From Swiss-Prot:
<dbReference type="Pfam" id="PF00433">
    <property type="entry name" value="Pkinase_C"/>
</dbReference>
<keyword id="KW-0067">ATP-binding</keyword>
<keyword id="KW-0496">Mitochondrion</keyword>
<feature type="region of interest" description="Autoinhibitory domain">
    <location>
        <begin position="424"/>
        <end position="527"/>
    </location>
</feature>
<feature type="modified residue" description="Phosphoserine">
    <location>
        <position position="434"/>
    </location>
</feature>
<dbReference type="GO" id="GO:0032869">
    <property type="term" value="P:cellular response to insulin stimulus"/>
</dbReference>
<keyword id="KW-0131">Cell cycle</keyword>
<dbReference type="Pfam" id="PF00069">
    <property type="entry name" value="Pkinase"/>
</dbReference>
<keyword id="KW-0963">Cytoplasm</keyword>
<dbReference type="InterPro" id="IPR017892">
    <property type="entry name" value="Pkinase_C"/>
</dbReference>
<comment type="function">
    <text>Serine/threonine-protein kinase that acts downstream of mTOR signaling in response to growth factors and nutrients to promote cell proliferation, cell growth and cell cycle progression. Regulates protein synthesis through phosphorylation of EIF4B, RPS6 and EEF2K, and contributes to cell survival by repressing the pro-apoptotic function of BAD. Under conditions of nutrient depletion, the inactive form associates with the EIF3 translation initiation complex.</text>
</comment>
<dbReference type="GO" id="GO:0004674">
    <property type="term" value="F:protein serine/threonine kinase activity"/>
</dbReference>
<dbReference type="GO" id="GO:0038202">
    <property type="term" value="P:TORC1 signaling"/>
</dbReference>
<dbReference type="GO" id="GO:0006417">
    <property type="term" value="P:regulation of translation"/>
</dbReference>
<feature type="modified residue" description="Phosphoserine">
    <location>
        <position position="447"/>
    </location>
</feature>
<feature type="binding site">
    <location>
        <position position="123"/>
    </location>
    <ligand>
        <name>ATP</name>
    </ligand>
</feature>
<keyword id="KW-0808">Transferase</keyword>
Length: 527
């Protein structure tokens, strides 16, 4: 029987297969600092005299030349400074990247405010579909909160999150390299050095999640994206389980069967060691063209995972064979990575002996595959079944009641990098200290983000009183969030502006799908 692949495309809409998650709390707001320099009455009086002198030809204690003045256009944007309110109309639809049971994923361009002109992926989820099931709602919250909390070079970045009366919107970085699955589909199998690179970057992402008490639980080629340089980015955090530290287990039956650890199938309780089994299954898939245990149907696949011997092709090196055996141990306690060293145990294996981990984390190691892209908007690495469709975000005409909308309070988010850019853009610091400083209005910069209680989407009872944990330093921006207004209106919003596909100066056909993988594992294009 042919395996049905969850074909949601880029950043798939959550597929809540018996998932579990916990609600969280915490609201963040913008606080304005006190004026930098209000000035004394004497200074104001002196300023008044200065103005009088300027009215008479600039004669007086200050001679002001034009080189000391800064010109800028007076507009609504420059006068009403501060973070913009993000809404669907801020984005122009470019292409469809994927579809799922809960909504669509679009390639979009921001057309207003900060990041104007930049390309993103916009994940649109229908509230009415999500609230039908409590677990679906909880896992939507969990995915959004994990994306907010986790910042790492090999994990997708959340830029904005906002909502309307009937929809949730996640604005993510656009990863133009497409899915790792597409590369496997095209190449058939990877050489060991190629697989080593991808597995090393993935192991660093998994290790970072585990440090935060998060189990990923859905590692497979479809959930591994590549950026424009070819580096790995983990996506789709709907199956993650939080607050799983040493000694803690969970019992949810979830994941994709071919990559699922035996302890999940047996429902005997599992911990972060399941991710290392999945890494082994993924490694086997990369090197042989299929996962280690597959059957004609779901039951036979499960039986093989629980009972069958691992068959290793003779062409694999001794290091690859040894790593596969240690990752695919059915006894979770003896599995490589299950010990206190976690990712460090896996990374110390001789298979990774040529990896410089510091340079890898800094993304200084050249990827084995670099996408050939014609422009920032290039979608050639994505399935043309989706990209050739006309992008349409249906009108928001299914608004929930006010009580039903309460579960989505606190969904809104703005990435700290965006807040910093807004702060820098509107600082208007003079290059030369000018007398205008004494007579103009003082600047009011945006203050650092502060905690405040009362939100349903935070991270536990202590979130409102404790300082946010300082993240591990990576070669990227640090974490932080910003709460903005939540739209609860039941009014229907107009559809987003549409750009027709295959338009513009850059038009490139998707690469041909060379079907080298086994028939039952090939991409199922039926929705």
């Amino acid at each position: 029987m042919r395996r049905r692949r969850r074909r949601d495309g880029f950043y798939p809409a959550p597929d809540f297969r018996d998932r579990e998650a916990e609600d969280m709390a915490g609201v963040f707001d913008i606080d304005l600092d006190q004026p930098e320099d209000a000035g004394s009455e004497d200074e104001l009086e002196e300023g008044g005299q200065l103005n009088e002198s300027m009215d008479h030809g600039g004669v007086g204690p200050y001679e002001l030349g034009m080189e000391h003045c800064e010109k800028f256009e007076i507009s609504e944007t420059s006068v009403n400074r501060g973070p913009e309110k993000i809404r669907p109309e801020c984005f122009e639809l470019l292409r469809v990247l994927g579809k799922g049971g809960y909504g669509k994923v679009f390639q979009v361009r921001k057309v207003t405010g900060a990041n104007t002109g930049k390309i993103f992926a916009m994940k649109v989820l229908k509230k009415a579909m999500i609230v039908r099931n409590a677990k679906d709602t909880a896992h939507t919250k969990a995915e959004r909160n994990i994306l907010e909390e986790v910042k790492h070079p090999f994990i997708v970045d959340l830029i904005y999150a906002f909502q309307t009366g009937g929809k949730l919107y996640l604005i993510l970085e656009y990863l133009s390299g497409g899915e790792l699955f597409m590369q496997l589909e095209r190449e058939g199998i990877f050489m060991e050095d190629t697989a080593c690179f991808y597995l090393a970057e993935i192991s660093m992402a998994l290790g970072h999640l585990h440090q935060k008490g998060i189990i990923y639980r859905d590692l497979k080629p479809e959930n591994i994206m590549l950026n424009h340089q070819g580096h790995v980015k983990l996506t789709d955090f709907g199956l993650c389980k939080e607050s799983i530290h040493d000694g803690t287990v969970t019992h949810t039956f979830c994941g994709t069967i071919e990559y699922m650890a035996p302890e999940i199938l047996m429902r005997s309780g599992h911990n972060r060691a399941v991710d290392w089994w999945s890494l082994g299954a993924l490694m086997y898939d990369m090197l042989t063209g299929a996962p280690p245990f597959t059957g004609e149907n779901r039951k036979k696949t499960i039986d093989k995972i629980l009972k069958c011997k691992l068959n290793l092709p003779p062409y694999l090196t001794q290091e690859a064979r040894d790593l596969l055996k240690k990752l695919l141990k059915r006894n979770a306690a003896s599995r490589l990575g299950a010990g206190p060293g976690d990712a460090g145990e896996v990374q110390a294996h001789p298979f990774f002996r040529h990896i410089n981990w510091e340079e890898l984390l800094a993304r200084k190691v050249e990827p084995p595959f670099k996408p050939l892209l014609q422009s920032e908007e290039d979608v050639s690495q994505f399935d043309s079944k989706f990209t050739r469709q006309t992008p349409v975000d249906s009108p928001d005409d299914s608004a929930l009641s006010e009580s039903a909308n309460q579960v989505f309070l606190g969904f809104t988010y703005v990435a700290p990098s965006v807040l910093e850019s807004v702060k820098e853009k509107f600082s208007f610091e003079p290059k030369i200290r000018s007398p205008r400083r004494f007579i103009g209005s003082p600047r009011t910069p945006v203050s650092p983000v502060k905690f405040s209680p009362g939100d349903f989407w935070g991270r536990g009872a202590s979130a409102s009183t404790a300082n946010p944990q300082t993240p591990v330093e990576y070669p990227m921006e640090t974490s932080g969030i910003e709460q903005m207004d939540v739209t609860m209106s039941g009014e229907a919003s107009a559809p987003l502006p549409i750009r027709q596909p295959n338009s513009g100066p850059y038009k490139k056909q998707a690469f041909p799908m060379i079907s080298k993988r086994p028939e039952h594992l090939r991409m199922n294009l039926e929705l």
